[in-house]
């Protein structure tokens, strides 16, 4: 029996470890890695192990050629833990991480999935619960929903380049509601009580990096913000938390995936737009107090010479596109 791993990112490498443990023969294909391009015709493989980020059209093609499996399919089939699936456009990583902290004191939980910890590395590792962060890509490729508990946090327009329409994106996200039990909430305490039947002790949660993270007294790094809804949320937090402390917003990325929607951002003293897509972003952002810079370094140099600016909110609001931002510039900057 011969298998193919399609895609060699985090999930693809976890497929590799999984198949090696089972002593199974396999090839690897990744269009971005030259040494992984020479493979047999797809029909020659008994199984194709497919990563979540593979385009939908390719995934459908592969299914006509062979038996296609995802890491979620395998985890459902082989793992015995109680499975808690969490999805949403925004705050899914944070909610998963906060819920994990409520369980963690008992050492009975996995935190896996889109948050960056591969599912296949946690199969039957003795934990009672598995908190699984689920992206729309994973849900789209999910053949059968075997979640014991499904949580939908929120839905807003995102990944329209993959889904084609907001209606399709919503339909995909709502697949989590076909779980054995489902809930719509963003409250980790409510989720914990719903799953376990007992109340959790109040905690001061640790937060994930790059999600409205204070990296100094004057800089907030929200660089995981890659859609306009998460940017608006960051601005709401800044408007409340930085009262009487003026701040600038730095934004960048590719507005194509937001379909070049027009937006006005209320709160920042200035909006600094930088990166390869700066002109397109400038056409989208309707603020009059905006300035355009070639890159992040030049935007920060501008701030250094503005004595009235006290705080920086770095929240891109768009996927990175062709921008390659070095956040070390941000961390090194003190106002």
Task: Put a short name on every predicted segment.
Residues 255-310:
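C-terminal helical cap/extension that packs against the catalytic core
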Residues 14-18, 108-109, 187-269:
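Nucleotide phosphate-binding/pyrophosphate-handling subdomain across enzymes
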């Amino acid at each position: 029996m011969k298998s193919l791993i399609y895609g060699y990112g985090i999930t693809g490498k976890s497929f590799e470890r999984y198949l090696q443990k089972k002593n199974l023969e396999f090839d690897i294909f990744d269009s971005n890695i030259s040494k992984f391009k020479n493979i047999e015709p797809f029909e020659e493989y008994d199984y194709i192990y497919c990563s979540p980020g593979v385009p939908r059209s390719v995934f459908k093609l592969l299914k006509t050629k062979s038996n296609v499996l995802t890491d979620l399919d395998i985890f459902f089939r082989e793992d015995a833990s109680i499975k808690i699936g969490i999805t949403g456009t925004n705050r899914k990583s944070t909610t998963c991480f906060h819920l994990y902290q409520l369980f963690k004191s008992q050492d009975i939980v996995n935190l896996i999935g889109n948050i960056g910890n591969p599912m296949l590395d946690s199969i039957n590792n003795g934990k009672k619960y598995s908190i699984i962060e689920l992206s729309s890509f994973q849900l789209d490729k999910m053949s059968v929903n075997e979640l014991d508990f499904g949580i939908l946090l929120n839905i807003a327009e995102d990944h329209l380049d993959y889904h084609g329409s907001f209606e399709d994106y919503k339909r995909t996200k709502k697949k989590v509601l076909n779980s054995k039990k489902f809930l719509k909430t963003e409250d980790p305490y409510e989720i914990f009580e719903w799953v376990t039947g007992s109340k959790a002790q109040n905690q001061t949660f640790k937060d994930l990096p790059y999600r409205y993270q204070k990296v100094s007294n004057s800089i907030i790094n929200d660089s995981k913000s890659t859609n306009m809804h998460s940017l608006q949320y960051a601005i709401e937090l800044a408007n409340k938390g930085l009262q009487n402390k003026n701040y600038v917003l730095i934004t960048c990325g590719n507005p194509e995936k937001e379909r070049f929607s027009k937006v006005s951002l209320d709160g920042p003293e200035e909006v600094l737009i930088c990166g390869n897509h700066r002109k397109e972003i400038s056409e989208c952002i309707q603020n009059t107090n905006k300035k355009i810079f070639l890159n992040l370094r030049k935007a920060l140099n501008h701030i250094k010479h503005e004595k009235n600016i006290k705080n920086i909110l770095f929240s891109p609001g768009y996927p990175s596109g062709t921008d390659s931002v070095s956040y070390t510039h941000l961390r090194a900057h003190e106002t």
